[in-house]
Design a protein with these regions (language model features):
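Primarily recognizes the serine-hydrolase "nucleophile elbow" in alpha/beta-hydrolase
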Residues: 305-365
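The feature captures the conserved acid-bearing segment of alpha/beta-hydrolase catalytic domains
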Residues: 358-421
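Short beta-strand segments that buttress and anchor functional surface loops
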Residues: 196-205
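Short, surface-exposed "cap/lid" segments of acyl-processing enzymes
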Residues: 205-275
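Alpha/beta-hydrolase active-site loop
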Residues: 277-312
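C-terminal catalytic histidine-bearing segment of alpha/beta-hydrolase fold enzymes
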Residues: 423-485
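N-terminal targeting or regulatory segments adjacent to alpha/beta-hydrolase or S9 domains
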Residues: 1-194, 482-485
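Short, flexible, mixed-charge acidic loops at enzyme active sites
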Residues: 272-284, 363-367
Length: 485
């Protein structure tokens, strides 16, 4: 029987050659290329809503200046992209019918269609060869900003500033009786795994779309297996791409080891990308408001997924994340105390996540790379204004999980998710030293270490096993002592 394969890119990343991705010179190069990559995505998002309207309309949608001298080249690029999108839509329609509809399909047919869908999705999501010339010539910005003024934000979010649980909490203790119904797609066979998708209406009042996630389980396993819910970082396309590092390093690796992994699409990411914007762009475009809108929605959706895992029989459930995904996990650890018990995770593990988004907006290298600092200043934001929104942007002073249930990995040279913000938070929360690991890496190097190694995976699954064996009452941890590696 046919199965999806482990990506050759991931095999290379796991090899000795992949160690280059943990090094500072390659990180510098990757970060330098990021604005161009985002500009290509911005151009594609603009093309999605301006096909047929001509080059001038496309440039307006892209938030780019007029460029009559490029109209012929843009016209050709749009014609090429129209074919890419038509193919993407045709394959997506067949995939939807096969995995979510009543159409009868065989396992082999679903594997073939999943491969075809990923190729078409990837070609549509990141058409670098089609729009790269616009990014290279700096005509298209990396982000189309629409930053609200501080006064507008204060007026709109006054109630939440006074009571953050309005954003992060649930209405009452009976919420589990009215949670959105979680639907499950048909399965597809992966490399030693069974994989399927979930979807449900987000409980957030501020996002208002369908939450989605991909699930990885051991082939032939029972339902009562420990589960990890793990969020990817900013800009992730999830399974819209042929290669998704977290899929291989977290989803499939844990499933082959006997665990269930749930990899959600964060709001405005992956399959939740809004028309006319690229994956993750809304999070950047309306800072700082968009940051806590995303966090609030993702935190509530995590509660739904934790509850779903328990209804499936999971004896213990952890929540984790990388970078922005780690910020979501930190927020869950700090905000879940008043939730109904089935929605609260047993453990939280973060990788390369900042301890303060408020400080990150002032100190992160990414902010200047993508011109977010200029956009905030142009809208009138000062450090003092941002500090007013810290109750919504940052984790609270004390966690709602026992500190022994919190694990943290971060890079000692991280200038994207500033190192000191993470170190300060874990000290403030009294996270045991044995639960904290500092890697001698930058931001992308820390992510590469997660993808290439197994320390995060071994630590969390060992903790899940202990809790499953003791009925979730064990607060002791034998995680590796804090070191720098």
């Amino acid at each position: 029987m046919d199965r999806l394969d482990t990506s050759r890119v991931h095999r290379l990343l796991e090899s000795p050659v992949g160690g280059l991705f943990e090094t500072a010179p390659l990180e510098t190069l990757q970060l330098r290329r990021l604005p161009r990559q985002f500009a290509v995505r911005r151009a594609r998002a603009a093309a999605d809503v301006s096909l047929g309207a001509g080059p001038a309309a496309f440039l307006r949608e892209a938030d780019a200046p007029p460029a009559p001298h490029l109209h012929d080249r843009i016209e050709a690029a749009l014609a090429e992209f129209a074919e890419i999108r038509e193919r993407h839509e045709e394959v997506s329609e067949r995939w939807e019918a096969a995995f979510w509809g009543d159409e009868e399909t065989t396992p082999n047919e679903r594997v073939a269609l999943e491969r075809e869908r990923r190729r078409a999705d990837a070609a549509h999501a990141r058409p670098s060869s089609t729009f790269g010339f616009l990014a290279s010539d700096h005509f298209v910005p990396p982000v189309a900003f629409d930053v609200p003024s501080p006064d507008d934000a204060r007026e709109r979010w006054a109630h939440e500033l006074a009571e953050p649980e309005r954003l992060y909490g649930f209405a009452d203790s009976t919420v589990t009786e009215s949670l959105p119904r979680v639907s499950r797609s048909k399965t597809v066979l992966g490399p030693g795994t069974v994989e399927y998708r979930l979807r449900f209406e987000t409980p957030s009042l501020h996002v208002g779309d369908t939450a989605t996630a991909r699930v990885y389980e051991p082939d032939g396993a029972a339902d009562d297996i420990p589960t990890l819910v793990f969020f990817s970082g900013l800009g992730s396309y999830g399974d819209r791409l042929s290669y998704w590092p977290e899929e291989e390093a977290i989803g499939r690796r844990l499933a082959r080891d006997g665990y269930r992994a749930v990899l959600p699409d964060a709001p405005w990411h992956g399959r939740r990308e809004p028309l006319g914007q690229f994956s993750g762009e809304p999070y950047l475009a309306r800072m700082p408001v968009s940051a806590f809108e995303l966090l609030g929605a993702a935190v509530q959706e995590t509660g739904v997924l934790v509850d779903w895992a328990r209804t499936e029989g999971a004896p213990a459930v952890a929540v984790g994340g990388l970078s922005l995904g780690g910020s979501i996990a930190f927020a869950v650890a700090g905000r879940c105390g008043e939730w109904p018990e089935p929605m609260r995770p047993d453990l939280v593990g973060t990788v390369a996540a900042p301890g303060s988004l408020m400080q990150t907006l002032s100190e992160s290298k990414l902010v200047s790379l993508l011109d977010l600092d200029d956009a905030l200043s142009a809208a009138g934001w000062t450090d003092e204004d941002l500090n007013e929104f810290a109750p919504l942007l940052d984790p609270p002073a004390e966690p709602d999980l026992a500190p022994e249930r919190i694990f943290c990995w971060y890079g000692s040279h991280d200038d994207v998710a500033p190192t000191e913000t993470t170190a300060t938070l874990v000290r403030q929360w009294d996270v045991p030293r044995r639960n904290v690991r500092t890697w001698d890496r930058g931001h992308l190097g820390t992510a590469a270490r997660l993808y290439r190694g197994d320390e995060f995976q071994r630590t969390l699954t060992a903790a899940l096993d202990r809790l499953a064996a003791t009925g979730r009452d064990d607060d002791e941890s034998d995680a590796t002592a804090e070191t720098t590696t």
